[in-house]
């Protein structure tokens, strides 16, 4: 029996070529592409503008892979966490984060993660595989629908801060963003999309060379090499000096401000010297620092810093002319906060 190919892996041109090679008109490819990405149908039978014979031919050759929300949880603060079942049975998680003025989708790019950051629940999961472009797109599509249903407004922002390191799935993430921003997809502005990376220098430079239009955030957490290596072991492979050079290249090419994600922990990075190192690291380009409240994970050894440590960071950063925000996490009661994804449900199925 012929293995059916996921039709959503084909470009519009490949669809047009398929129809031509099967004795049909190329414009059928345009129609199918619209059904798949704008209208989001799950079956060929639903493509009602196509002749029945064409729909049957498609069903013979292709499948339409779609994600399924296995479990949806709602937090006391309105945050929604989705346990998402992929076509091969694997699970990832995505989150809808509401505020008074906007709704943000936090989406995953990999099943698990291979970077082993010691403070992150996802790092405890073995990386199984990269997500496909349609699987990333579908997470956003589902959360847009949830935003409209629960909050009466379309999705306003997307952050790649879920499970996985987006730059280790570079091509698929960029293909997904292309679909998300295309008028033939969701039509979202790339300026409303932020890709958060732990910092892979050569791929940050590649993004700059590829002239991407979305925003960049770096999961930094310490600007002292030995401290960062202790909490993010891959820093030994991609040291801060190389990361800084890559970010300088990014800014030179894009002129876009760089955002740093930064959790402050008790006894790890809560001293004045830590703030001074961060200021020195940031000064080469316009920067914004998001100070993030730590969210404990099961059996974790990390502790929240004293509020005075956050005040010290905020005061010193602002005095140095660096924009700073203190981000209080949402969805903690359902393990949907930063660093908590995959803390319970996915691990239980390993």
Residue ranges and their predicted role:
Residues 80, 92, 103-107, 115, ...:
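Generic beta-strand structural signal
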